[in-house]
Amino acid sequence: MSAVITPADFNDYKVADISLAAWGRRETIIAESEMPALMGLRRKYASEQPLKGAKILGCIHMTIQTAVLIETLVALGAEVRWSSCNIFSTQDQAAASIAAAGIPVFAWKGETEEEYEWCLEQTILKDGQPWDANMILDDGGDLTELLHKKYPQVLDRVHGVTEETTTGVHRLLDMLAKGELKIPAINVNDSVTKSKNDNKYGCRHSLNDAIKRGTDHLLSGKQALVIGYGDVGKGSAQSLRQEGMIVKVSEVDPICAMQACMDGFELVSPFIDGINDGTEASIDKALLGKIDLIVTTTGNVNVCDANMLKALKKRAVVCNIGHFDNEIDTAFMRKNWAWEEVKPQVHKIHRTGAGSFDPQNDDYLILLAEGRLVNLGNATGHPSRIMDGSFANQVLAQIFLFGQKYADLSPAQKAERLTVEVLPKKLDEEVALEMVRGFGGVVTQLTKQQADYIGVTVEGPFKPHAYRY
């Protein structure tokens, strides 16, 4: 898409500065050249228009790459309304370019919590009334939760939700277990072409970038503690190792802990003998007193708690690349310590009390992005080529769920299909193949004899569902 309209033609949006639209359009065109899977889906399904009639409520980081996703959904027939899932992650030029193309969007970098909630509401509402949406695309689950709690009537028309992140999937599974989930969901996060690309390789690229942009620190030779060794933790540990840091890992899952050891990282715990009893006495102060950088990667709560924050080395950098800001106990920091803004999304947290502070005080922590996603708060997130896999999965998931027409089923059929599932492996392989072609790679085709020998078809899928990549 290349059309840019004037603001007078369209006012169903709120962005920081609509005059940034041309800049956003130029960056979007470059991003398209780095997103071969997404652009391949545009070409493949252009005539079929599989999303014609789809009305999608979207809540995901409003970046340049997301602009390519949005315009792909529109190119395949959908109408959308959009907001960002994080108060710091919007690239204002991207939001402006989407608004200038006549697409409703409500997002700007540096929203307050109240403004964030307002943007979510505007995604749902058109002219003050709930839009007749029939699909949801979410990242983290805030939009899905708001619809269930405040606008349940909208869900009567909705065919399903596609969820981008680990945190959002956890929330969906919890709702399903409690009998609260009203619509089926596709777990995009656990598609291989999402989890291995976005969570692992994306973090490998974007974590060190964000820390260096935020602090201008040299990382080489310093000690880092990565909390969690799932796919995000794996990519994060690699990112810091690339910078020459001495990287330690903390993990609760024995399998992930084993992987950290096998990958050559020292497995440690911030707690003596690994036991957190909630007291300062349980903290391994000798360990934390040497840590220059701590990164949370888990999607869990208080994995860097108040007692850990008290024990960290003076002037240590603290950041999160998991999801919400509650991975770090920022609530404790706000209540008990003084905050000094160095620049947007970079704060010195003075551990000398909640009142005034001495600018020359050296007992402080450097907190990035207020504990929210550091790679989107202090930098621009993952590269386009990484997000290509994630967003191609989102498009295929939207097509898949929209085609299932859940809202039109009988109650008995709905009960049977009310699930949280991953995309079929064949679609995962379709995304991967488009990405490989984008790299100029050539995939070898099985012979009929070889396919028969391992019990698959020549066209795939090539691995059983339980295969761990």
From Swiss-Prot:
Keywords: Cytoplasm, Hydrolase, NAD, One-carbon metabolism. One of its GO terms (biological process) is one-carbon metabolic process. Its main location: cytoplasm. GO terms for molecular function: adenosylhomocysteinase activity. Binds 1 NAD(+) per subunit. Substrate binds at residues 63, 139, 164, 194, 198. It catalyses: S-adenosyl-L-homocysteine + H2O = L-homocysteine + adenosine. Its cofactor is NAD(+). NAD(+) binds at residues 165-167, 199, 228-233, 251, 300, 321-323, 375. Its EC number is 3.13.2.1. The keyword Cytoplasm applies. Pathway: Amino-acid biosynthesis; L-homocysteine biosynthesis; L-homocysteine from S-adenosyl-L-homocysteine: step 1/1. It is found in: Cytoplasm. GO terms for cellular component: cytosol. May play a key role in the regulation of the intracellular concentration of adenosylhomocysteine. Belongs to the adenosylhomocysteinase family. HAMAP family: AdoHcyase (MF_00563). This is Adenosylhomocysteinase.
